[in-house]
């Protein structure tokens, strides 16, 4: 805060001489003055703002501590809170998302007018908001109450998830410590058996490794991280028409599939990848790779885009592929599946 900001414009007191001095503002005009001036000037009721040129009538109970250093930001936050406490309709109260977005845009326009509009525009909009608040008082109170409950729910969810993350972290640390202890115990056991047993070293090492593996497996089963959000999942209202992007293929919704993945293919390109440790670490499997290749090969067979769009416009689309059966169509969609066996390199 600047040096001028540390001096009360009314009594000229300085925060340098009074470090505990607090500055207050009134939402009527947002002129700043110290707490002592507020107590002194407004002790006997409403008084005109003591700042030169300001004719606003101020009340003592309306003064509040200034949160933001910039008064313009302070004013915008207060105006936004007042407007949104009245215009507080929820998204589920509108038929379409466009209607809800238009309502949000109207809120922003109202806030902008109250901040930057002319005096006549501000007065007209203020009267309009007051009339709306009076007419829809019950709905406004209900929505504000519901919003407070949701905020409380979100706070509880955040606190609960924070506790779960902390508990999972402690469990992971404990599991890591136990794994290190088992590793050191296995080393000591190996040294002890090599020194005392008459068996060959390879068999002793295998037995020690088997024992260590059993301990590790048992510890992994016991170590189960707690869920982070399962008990706080919200039930979302399903819309009558899901807003999903249109795909001209619809291969991901063709049931049953037009192919069947075989257990083995004579493939010299993809098959060696199954033995690569880097691919194995990422979860690579041959069957999943072949299934993806065949899915791409059969993507959209038997689907006519124009027919599907026409069915959707007529309200008959159920989200599945709409095949067009012709005499030249080589794909028979009536069959549950088509056996496909790739003999050459995919």
From Swiss-Prot:
Pfam families: MAT1, zf-C3HC4_5. It is found in: Nucleus. This is RNA polymerase II transcription factor B subunit 3. It comes from Yarrowia lipolytica (strain CLIB 122 / E 150) (Yeast). A zinc finger (RING-type) spans 8-53. The lineage of its organism: Eukaryota, Fungi, Dikarya, Ascomycota, Saccharomycotina. CDD domains: RING-HC_TFB3-like. Coiled coil: none annotated. Residues 325-335 have a biased composition (Basic and acidic residues). It comes from the Eukaryota. Residues 314-346 are annotated as: Disordered. One of its GO terms (molecular function) is cyclin-dependent protein serine/threonine kinase activator activity. GO terms for biological process: DNA repair; nucleotide-excision repair; regulation of transcription by RNA polymerase II. GO terms for cellular component: transcription factor TFIIH holo complex; transcription factor TFIIK complex. Acts as a component of the general transcription and DNA repair factor IIH (TFIIH or factor B), which is essential for both basal and activated transcription, and is involved in nucleotide excision repair (NER) of damaged DNA. TFIIH as CTD kinase activity and DNA-dependent ATPase activity, and is essential for polymerase II transcription. InterPro entries: Cdk-activating_kinase_MAT1_cen, MAT1/Tfb3, Znf_RING, Znf_RING/FYVE/PHD, Znf_RING_CS. Keywords: Metal-binding, Nucleus, Transcription, Transcription regulation, Zinc, Zinc-finger. NCBIfam families: cdk7.
């Amino acid at each position: 805060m600047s040096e001028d900001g540390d001096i009360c414009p009314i009594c000229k007191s300085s925060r340098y001489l009074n470090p505990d001095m607090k500055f207050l503002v009134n939402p009527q005009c947002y002129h700043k003055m110290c707490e002592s001036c507020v107590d002194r000037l407004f002790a006997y009721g409403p008084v005109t703002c003591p700042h030169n040129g300001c004719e606003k009538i101020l009340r003592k109970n309306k003064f509040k501590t200034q949160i933001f250093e910039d008064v313009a930001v302070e004013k915008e936050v207060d105006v936004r809170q007042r407007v949104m406490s009245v215009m507080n309709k929820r998204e589920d109260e509108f038929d379409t998302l466009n209607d809800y977005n238009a309502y949000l845009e109207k809120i922003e326009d109202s806030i902008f007018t109250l901040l930057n509009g002319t005096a006549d525009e501000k007065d007209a909009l203020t009267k309009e908001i007051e009339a709306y608040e009076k007419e829809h008082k019950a709905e406004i109170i209900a929505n504000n109450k519901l919003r407070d409950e949701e905020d409380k729910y979100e706070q509880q969810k955040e606190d609960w998830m924070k506790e779960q993350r902390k508990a999972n972290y402690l469990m992971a640390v404990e599991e890591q410590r136990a794994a290190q202890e088992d590793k050191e115990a296995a080393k000591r056991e190996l040294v002890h058996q090599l020194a005392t047993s008459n068996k060959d070293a390879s068999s002793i090492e295998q037995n020690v490794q088997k024992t260590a593996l059993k301990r590790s497996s048992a510890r992994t089963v016991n170590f189960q991280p707690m869920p982070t959000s399962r008990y706080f999942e919200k039930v979302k209202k399903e819309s009558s028409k899901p807003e999903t992007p249109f795909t001209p293929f619809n291969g991901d919704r063709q049931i049953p599939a037009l192919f069947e993945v075989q257990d083995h293919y004579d493939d010299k390109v993809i098959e060696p990848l199954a033995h690569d440790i880097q691919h194995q670490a990422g979860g690579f499997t041959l069957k999943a790779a072949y299934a993806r290749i065949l899915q791409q090969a059969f993507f959209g067979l038997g689907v006519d885009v124009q027919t599907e769009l026409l069915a959707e416009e007529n309200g008959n689309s159920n989200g599945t592929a709409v095949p067009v059966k012709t005499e030249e169509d080589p794909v028979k969609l009536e069959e549950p599946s088509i056996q496909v066996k790739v003999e050459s390199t995919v």
